[in-house]
Structure formats: structure tokens, C-alpha cells
């Protein structure tokens, strides 16, 4: 006869005699609480047994819906009582295990959504010789290679190879990133639609968020760390970068500012625009970025001073970064070389340009829309967590 965990018990088992295995959380004579990280059950023993908090036990008794009665100890392994700062306390008492259960439901919802859209789940290398040259991301060295900051370049090679719709839940790493919304290692959800553009990916993003939120909380809504509720019904509002800088900072042309004084552009973005977006009681797509702020996106066909790039903000949290993808190999090489030169001028690490990616573009990449979404951030908002570490098994501070 196998054993159940305390969190396995359900009303359907009332009246059955069951074996239940777990850890003793508290003991008082002939009564004790047996728990796992996700739940517990009160046990009423036939006789006093000398059980102590921390013991690992298997108990046999009749389940009443409230407790196990007339119970016997089948086996006992004496163990120390869990410390308040230990792993058991963090997972069982501070709710991290429940967050991991929500994470599992969210992952299933992601895979279900993309299966319904006929996407293929893929895996690409985590350690690469050329991690990209993004001006604002530093890669972590790994035995002569680098850990990926994003799976983007290899996924685009798959588009060139003829895969029409792909997604990946990738482990990504970035150097010197740690805070309420940042971890040096995190899960990136990235997807691409060949022969598609920004509109299709914007639609994916809206539908995916609803699906994940419903899987976690039963409703299409997200929660900021302060408790603000964000309904996900209806099309999300869109505001261009130019409009946002005017609305929240009184700056007439963000594109001109990004070209003439990039440092000031980022200062205004962080101190005025993002806080302004955080005050809005709804999800907002910020799009039409200055061309010099989107090295991997194609330029707008109606205004070549802006690129077809978007980010989604919910409660001031940037959730994703999407593009109508650049497919021109010569333009992509020029942008890579420009960014590499800037990294060198700023005394930042300079990484090799990915020649295999550029060679793939030479073969012909179809027009595509793509998005990179911080899965951990989405889960954080789905459960209303205060920081990213609450939705991870072992954040950097717990490793």
C-alpha cells in the first residue's frame, strides 16, 4: 500500500483508512500535525508515541475530512525541528511551495496556449560563443563561451531553417542583475511567428496573459506588489514613446532626445515615463521606439525614425520586449558593428559578432514577429508577489 502526502488528501477519501507520509510540524501527546510543503493534516493517535517536531513519519488511520483518527505510527525517522531560516520553513511556512504550484499551472497554460496556436516548442544552446552585443546587457563568461542573455539569435536561425512558429522557455543569465525585479538567472519565454508582424504578436501577448492569469488565480487579472488589480479584458491600451514622453514628462519629441542626448532620454524614461505608466490602472503597450533603441527590429514603413518595437507595462513592471524583426543582413551587421564600437568606447565587455546568425540572414529570413517575456515577472504579477525571488525555487540569495 502506497503512502499519500498530506496535500494529496481530498473529500473523496473521507472514511477510508490511509497511509499518510510527511513531517511532524507539532506534537502534543497523542496528537500531532503532519505536513508537507503544500498542506497538512491533524493526526489523533491511538496512544502517546513520543513524536517530536521535525520527525519524518508514515501514519495509518481513518480520514474524516478533518483529521486522521485512531491512527498508528507505521515508521518514524527522528529529525531536528526545522529552523525558521531553513529551506523547509521557506517553502512550507512562507508560501514558496504554493508559489511553485502556481508556477507549474502557469507553465502548463503557456504550453497549452502555444499548442492551440500550433507552435513548436524548441530548445537552443544555453552556452554560446557569441551572446549578442546589446548595449545594456552583459553576459556571464562560461569556460571560453558565454551563458545566453536571450535565445533570440538561435531561434531566428530556426526561422530561417523553415520552422514557422516556435516558442521556448529558456534559462537566461545576465551579469550584475539582482533586485526586486531582477535575478542573474531567470526564465525567458520567447516566441516567433514567421510571415507575421507586430499585430499578431501583440494579440498573442494579450491572450497568453489572460490564459496564464486564469490558470493561477481563476480570473483574467494581475496584481501589483502593492495590491492594485489589473483587469486583462479587452484590447490593451497602446501609447507611442513620443506620446508617453509628452504625456508624462512634457517632452515634445523623445526620438530627437534619444539621438541628441541618450543619457537624458533614459533618465526621463526611468524617472517620469515608467512611473507614469505605473500609475495607470491597466496594462499598456509602449511602442514605436526610437530607431536607435531597437537594434534587432525593423524600421517603421511610415516613419523611419522609429522602430517596430513594443514593451508591455503592468503596474510599472516591464513584462516583455517585442519586435517586428529585422531581416536585412547588411543592416543587421552594421547595427552590430555600431553597438560593438560603442561597447568598446564605454569600456564595456566586447563580444564576438555572431557570424553564423548573419550567415543565416543571408540565406533569407522570412518577415517575423517575436517577443521575449519575463516569465518569472508574469508569475510574480499573477500571484501578487512582492519580489521575483518569491516565485523561484532558489533565487540568488538562497543558492
Q: Could you say what each language-model-derived stretch is?
A:
Residues 1-399:
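Class II aminoacyl-tRNA synthetase catalytic cores and aaRS-like
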Amino acid at each position: 500500500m502506497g503512502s499519500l502526502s498530506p496535500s494529496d488528501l481530498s473529500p473523496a477519501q473521507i472514511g477510508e483508512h490511509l497511509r499518510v507520509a510527511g513531517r511532524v510540524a507539532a506534537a502534543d501527546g497523542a496528537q500531532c500535525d503532519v505536513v508537507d510543503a503544500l498542506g497538512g493534516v491533524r493526526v489523533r493517535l491511538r496512544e502517546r508515541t513520543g513524536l517530536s517536531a521535525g520527525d519524518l513519519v508514515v501514519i495509518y488511520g481513518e480520514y474524516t475530512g478533518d483529521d486522521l483518527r485512531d491512527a498508528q505510527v507505521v515508521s518514524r525517522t527522528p529529525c531536528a525541528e526545522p529552523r525558521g531560516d531553513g529551506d523547509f520553513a521557506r517553502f512550507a511556512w512562507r508560501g514558496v511551495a504554493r508559489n511553485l504550484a502556481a508556477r507549474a499551472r502557469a507553465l502548463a497554460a503557456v504550453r497549452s496556449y502555444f499548442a492551440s496556436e500550433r507552435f513548436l516548442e524548441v530548445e537552443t544552446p544555453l552556452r554560446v560563443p557569441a551572446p549578442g552585443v546589446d548595449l545594456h546587457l552583459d553576459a556571464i563568461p562560461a569556460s571560453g563561451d558565454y551563458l545566453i542573455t536571450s535565445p533570440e539569435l538561435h531561434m531566428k536561425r530556426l526561422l530561417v531553417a523553415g520552422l514557422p512558429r516556435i516558442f521556448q522557455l529558456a534559462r537566461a543569465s545576465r551579469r550584475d542583475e539582482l533586485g526586486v525585479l531582477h535575478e542573474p538567472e531567470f526564465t525567458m519565454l520567447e516566441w516567433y511567428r514567421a510571415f507575421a508582424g507586430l499585430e499578431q504578436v501583440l494579440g498573442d501577448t494579450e491572450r497568453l496573459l489572460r490564459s496564464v492569469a486564469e490558470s493561477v488565480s481563476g480570473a483574467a487579472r494581475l496584481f501589483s506588489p502593492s495590491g492594485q488589480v489589473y483587469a486583462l479584458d479587452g484590447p490593451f491600451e497602446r501609447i507611442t514613446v513620443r506620446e508617453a514622453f509628452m504625456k508624462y514628462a512634457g517632452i515634445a519629441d523623445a526620438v530627437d532626445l534619444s539621438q541628441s542626448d541618450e543619457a537624458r532620454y533614459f533618465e526621463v524614461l526611468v524617472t517620469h515615463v515608467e512611473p507614469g505608466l505605473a500609475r495607470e490602472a491597466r496594462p499598456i503597450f509602449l511602442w514605436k521606439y526610437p530607431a536607435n533603441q531597437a537594434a534587432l527590429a525593423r524600421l517603421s514603413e511610415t516613419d523611419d525614425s522609429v522602430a517596430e518595437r513594443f514593451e508591455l507595462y503592468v503596474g510599472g513592471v516591464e513584462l516583455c520586449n517585442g519586435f517586428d524583426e529585422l531581416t536585412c543582413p547588411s543592416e543587421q551587421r552594421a547595427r552590430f558593428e555600431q553597438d560593438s564600437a560603442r561597447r568598446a568606447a564605454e569600456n564595456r565587455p566586447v563580444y564576438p559578432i555572431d557570424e553564423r546568425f548573419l550567415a543565416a540572414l543571408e540565406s533569407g529570413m522570412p518577415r517575423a514577429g517575436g517577443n521575449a517575456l519575463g516569465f518569472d515577472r508574469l508569475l510574480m504579477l499573477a500571484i501578487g508577489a512582492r519580489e521575483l525571488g518569491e516565485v523561484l525555487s532558489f533565487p540568488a540569495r538562497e543558492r
